[in-house]
Amino acid sequence: LLPATFSLDPIVGLTALLGIYGSSMYGGAIPAILINTPGTAVNALTTYEGTPMTRRGEARRALSLAYSASFCGGVFSVACLIALSPVLAKIAPMFGSREIFLAALLGIVLVILSHRGQVLAAGMTSCFGIWIGTIGLEPVKYSQRYTFGQSWLAGGVDLIVVVLGLFAISQAFLLLVEDDKFSKAEGIGGGLFAGFRELLRHKRVAAVSSSFGVAMGMIPGVGEFTAQFLSYTYAQKTSEAPEDFGNGSPEGLVASEAANNAVPAAAMIPLLALGIPGEALTAMMLSVFYVHSVVPGPQLFQSQLDFVVALYIALLILNVLVVAFLLVSTNQLLRVIEIPTRFLGVAILVLSFVGVYSLRNSAIDCAIAAGFGVLGFALKRLSLPIVPIILGMVLGGIMEIKLRTSMMRVDSPVDFINRPIAFILFVIILIVVGAHVRSAWLKYRIGKESSNGG
């Protein structure tokens, strides 16, 4: 739909892009919660908490809470864009290649350590995701890697193909091998704003997660994945019931959705102030700017302030309209869980393959998606983590490019962390890993002493 926006007025075209993207971020939580299939790649973590809540008969509560958290993150992000854009834009350029590499590495470390009791498995699946991300042309010399002489692998493995395979197609396989189940969808009971009232009980998690989303959105190349895993890990570490995470924790759901939806508006801070796109959405917005001869940067706030204000208003209105529509239509959306599981499995399978094929009109992509579907099916049956594969693919590519760029500019490993932000991130990584090692060692000692005493 991007080319269609070129014929529209700049603010109308940008509003259309923001509306489509924002709606997908909100709406992506719906299948993630109801049928364990993320609507977008960044809703993958929502399945961890949303699906178990649905299985407990709390689908309405999960959806309402997800909408509320998304609205909180979105509005908070827009408020930061409006109030703090001149100040916050100065921070983004301080993140060079070294800082972005360390931020991405921190994201990988946190997602691995957040899988309690499955740290080794999460580490292995993260490494597998990183390896998948290296298939194709390497980014500096453009030589082929791990293509095994197959030309169709030269373009790499598309992230969307992997996401649909690991989550949607694998879930379809699970539904097809199960006996038909009929669930009765509960009504919206409790009013349209029940989720907002419940969100007040998790206001600390919502506020911190939204802040993580804003901070990560401002850093070019980091985005939703790092933000949601930082938020999710924070919520888990500070929760009074960390054992509930992965089993339908409202706190985990709030953390994931608030962080996701705080990123897009925050990514516009470096775009508007410096002309630097922070992620895919702002890269598309930049093309709309150029088509209409709008030059983002400090001069934008002086020469076209009315355009900037209109963009702010559009962002706020979009958040209100999307969440209002979703809250009103929740009863209808809940009817999805009344569909017999085998029929639902076939529907997911068909829609997934149609979606994969439509990406590049490639039957090979469908075969790759099917392969990852089988892998996801096996991992789910073995109760092994899947999300680290996606994070490894996304952050692994960022880490490689930034590491290679950084190493060309430093003379020794010590120089890699000789800047303040890089040093702080490095220390945080050491503290996080050290704390986990210490915790694991103490747990081992206690277990050993109790077994000796017994």
Model-derived regions: residue spans:
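Membrane-embedded alpha-helical segments of transport systems
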Residues: 22-27, 68-80, 88, 132, ...
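Re-entrant/interfacial helical elements at transmembrane boundaries that shape
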Residues: 1-4, 21, 32-52, 83, ...
